[in-house]
Every structure is written in structure tokens, then in C-alpha cells.
Amino acid sequence: MSSVERIKEYTDIPSESNGYISPPANWPQTGDVELKNLSLRYSPHSSKALDNVSFKVKAGTKVGIVGRTGAGKSSIIAAIYRLSDWENGTITIDNKDIKHIPLERLRNSISCIPQDPTLFDGTVRSNLDPFDRYSDVQIYGVLSKVGLIEECDELCLIFEQEQPNFSSHKLRNRFIDLNTVVKSGGSNLSQGQRQLLCLARSMLGARNIMLIDEATASIDYISDAKIQKTIRETMKNTTILTIAHRLRSVIDYDKILVMEMGRVKEYDHPYTLISDRNTIFYRLCRQSGEFENLFELAKVSFDNKR
């Protein structure tokens, strides 16, 4: 009886609304993102998770989203990825309303690294490249960039390319090889390794927009710094929205979006915000215990971009 009730429960779940306009094959070509007067709530009688949110992100811009728990940070990611429908407002990517884009097309066009990465029962290779589109060299390349294998010089990768029987353990990676077993949910990996694998998978796709929801929260500072360096150096033209607990992770981004109670409170360069004692961001940096370091990093970033 319980099984029948559960089946009935599943059949009654409303389908996700789907779009009907197929964009060009190269969409999104640039990666401009705009939210305009967006309001979202998760149930009819709940308070708004997002309340009249508006901001623009130019193509290639790196935006750090910060705020206290429940401020609406993750709801922004959920809305852009259309995991939740909104009650009013619009989201456009390259001037196209994403509500009109078929869901599969939309989600295949955006890289998303969630708080809890999804990994499948299989191997490292099948998790990174489920459709067998990439060579071992390309896969090893992204594993190296995110720090899951030790730094390997170019000759090593050329060896792999030219000699199919080249022993992959010579790469001295944390995995035995690409056929290393990954259990369902990545239960045989640490939280940090799961997030790093998810980042590597996203990098293989080479999409113009990447959404990162607290992806480095469980990773040590050294690994976090390597990831952020990789993002900046290899994704210069990618539009990135990152939710981060560690202000250091986003202090040298192009913009900081400060959320509070579902509303946008501040949106500017980190140095501009941290220099103003009246901003919420200034207070968050003070409370972090590393204000002086954050201030200096923000200033260097600001000066370099002038």
C-alpha cells in the first residue's frame, strides 16, 4: 500500500515548465546575465526568498555573492538554473528570456557547481566525461588544473598523447588512474575531492557561464587558492557567479553582490565596498578576522583593473 501511495505521490508532482524557443546553437555566445525585478518564494504562503532583485553582469565578469545565511544567495543560483520558478520579474542571458528556453538546452548551456556535488557510481572518467567526448589528455589536464593530480610538465602530457600505453600512474595523481572507482554520491571521496571533481567536469564543458554555490566551503585554504587561481587564469572570458563563505575567495573579483533578506543591498567592486565603513560588506570583512589582508587584496585588484 505504501508503494502505491508513493507512486501516486510522484505522478501528482507537477512537471517543470518548459520553454518553447530554441536559441542559436552558439547561445550563449557572450555570457551577459541580467535579473530584473525578480521575486521568488518556495511556497505560496512563505516569505519571499528573493524580493525585487535586479542586477546586471557583463560577459566575462566575475561576481562574488555574499551575505548571511538565508539572505537569498542560493536562490539566485536556483533561479538562473531554473530549479525554482519565480512569481514575477525576468532573467535574461544574452538578451533572451530564459523562461522561453527549453530546460534541457538552458541547463546544458550553463555550468553549475552545487553545494553538494552529484557524482555517479562508476569511474573518474565516466563522472567527468559521461558521453565519452574528451581524450585522456584533456581529462588529465583539468584534473591537474584543479589540483587532483600533481603538477605535470608538458612533456608528460605529450607522452600520454603519443604513447597510448604510457603508464598513467607516472602522473602521480591522487587517483590510481581514470578507471579508479567512484561510488554513488562520491561516498569514497572527501567532500573537497567531490567538489573538485565537479569543478573539473564543468571545466571540460567550456561554457560561457558558470554558477558556483559554496563550492569551496569544505576545501582547505591552499586548495581553495589554487581553484580560484585556476578560475581566474583559465576562465578569463567566462561569466562567473560565486557564492562564498570565504571572503578571501572573491575579494579580487570584479564585483561583489551583497544580499540581505532576499534583497540586493550593495553591488560594486570589492575595494569600493570595503573602503566605505557604512557598507554591509565592510562589516562582513571586519567580522572575518582578516580585514587588513582583505583590504590589501581588494586594493591590488582594483589598481590592476584601472
From Swiss-Prot:
Entry keyword 4Fe-4S: no
Thylakoid keyword on record: no
CDD domains: ABCC_NFT1
GO cellular component entries: membrane
Binding site for ATP: 67-74
One Pfam short name: ABC_tran
Domain ABC transporter: start-end pairs: 33-286
Transmembrane regions: none
Alphabetically ordered keywords of this record: ATP-binding, Nucleotide-binding, Repeat
PROSITE patterns noted in UniProt: ABC_TRANSPORTER_1, ABC_TRANSPORTER_2
Gene Ontology MF annotations: ATP binding; ATP hydrolysis activity
GO aspect biological process, one term: transmembrane transport
Taxonomy, superkingdom: Eukaryota
Family the UniProt entry places it in: Belongs to the ABC transporter superfamily. ABCC family. Conjugate transporter (TC 3.A.1.208) subfamily.
The protein, known as: Putative uncharacterized protein YKR104W
Organism name: Saccharomyces cerevisiae (strain ATCC 204508 / S288c) (Baker's yeast)
